[in-house]
Amino acid sequence: ISHRINTVHELHNIPKQNGVEIDIRDFNDRLILQHDPFKDGEDFEEYLRHYNHGTMILNIKSERIEFNVLKLLKKYGIKKYFFLDSSFPMIVSLINKGESKIALRFSEFETIHNILKLNAKIDWVWIDCFTKLPINKENYKQLKDHNIKLCLVSPELQNQEHRIEEYKKYLLNKE
């Protein structure tokens, strides 16, 4: 998954089999691709017209636009996606409307217990590593036993690029 691919130009440089993470917010009554607030960005619907890649990770930056995003995903036939970094009230709202393509965060601060409470209602877990990698053999098995798909945040996004090889070796020994 390529991080923060918020323009059609960047999208065209991504191999078709790869997925992308995008930042979506509302701006002047439009859905746009933009990480930062108060700035304009490319039109989300126009971006979808060009999308024929792998999994799309939807990082919603303006809460309560999720249902409009879902309408556009359906319109353009995008089926491989999930919501990332949503607030818990929004997660519950999405679940109550039947949406399961949601990732709950698992980190040293957000425990596996909440994930397991909602495991039949969500498809993904997003593993973040603010200060350390939280996954171990036991919780990995718990997640996999519940058929939850896993997405690992790359350590450099939390200023831990120096630990990438360490984490890679650790994870390879977990399976």
Annotate each PLM feature.
Residues 1-175:
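Phosphate-group recognition and catalysis centered on beta-loop-alpha active-site segments
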